[in-house]
From Swiss-Prot:
Keywords: Membrane, Mitochondrion, Mitochondrion inner membrane, Transit peptide, Transmembrane, Transmembrane helix. Gene3D superfamilies: Mitochondrial import inner membrane translocase subunit Tim21. The chain crosses the membrane at residues 130-152. Residues 88-100 have a biased composition (Polar residues). The gene is TIM21. Belongs to the TIM21 family. This is Probable mitochondrial import inner membrane translocase subunit TIM21. GO terms for cellular component: cytosol; mitochondrion; TIM23 mitochondrial import inner membrane translocase complex. Residues 88-115 are annotated as: Disordered. It is a single-pass membrane protein. Expressed in leaves, sheath, flowers and buds. Lower expression in roots and stems.
Amino acid sequence: MMMMNLLRRSAIAIGRQSKSKLASFSSATQPCSGIPKSSKRVFSNSFLSKDSTGANGLLFRFRNPQASICTEARPKNINSSYFTRSFASRTSKEPGNQQNKAKKEVTTVEDPFDSPTYHIPEKPVTFTEGASYSLVILAGLGVAGAAGYGVFKELIFQPKEYKVFDKALKRIQDDGQVRVRIGSPIKGYGQETRNRAARQRIPNRVFTDEDGVEHVEVNFYIRGPQGAGKVYTEMFKDKAEKEWKYTYLIVEILTPSPAKLMLESYLPA
């Protein structure tokens, strides 16, 4: 009895194991197993059945001479590529749009320091400031006028002492007695110094006598190739003839041999 029971139990266990193996094999070899029912497509040699479209996958299974095909409809690649290209185009356009916006911002922003300042606030000028500016301008004009008058007087209206000096020097240069003693040419100058301005300044004295006659007295130095001397002269302006005439003209030879020469002397008529 015990032997029979053991044989039954072993047979039952073997049967259960075989059933489980068959079930697993059938499930593994079953067409379209593991694929959602809503996405299966089954094709046979006699008819075509369409359940629905679904996710990815394609599976073939041959159970008998009559083959059945289980497929799974996949979305068209056009849609996925379209979405990919559209996304790429959007991402590629975004940097360009950002650059264009940045350029627009750069062009529209203005530097406040470059903008023209047409309205500069001006400080009102008071009466005192205006008067002081006017005085400064008038003083400058006065100085410029005085300088211009001095230059004009020196160039156009020669002073009286220089007229007497030029006339006396011309008379001495033409005199033979002086040329024999100091040589020729003879030059005249105001003072014995190397200062050019001092040499050009002629010592003089201007006065009017009791008759109302104007007199000019000058003295200057002369020098020639062989010697030098000093000149004393005085001239007056004749009212009748309106000319300058000598009162006297004396030349004192200093070198090489001292001598005094009276070249001109006025003798009233």
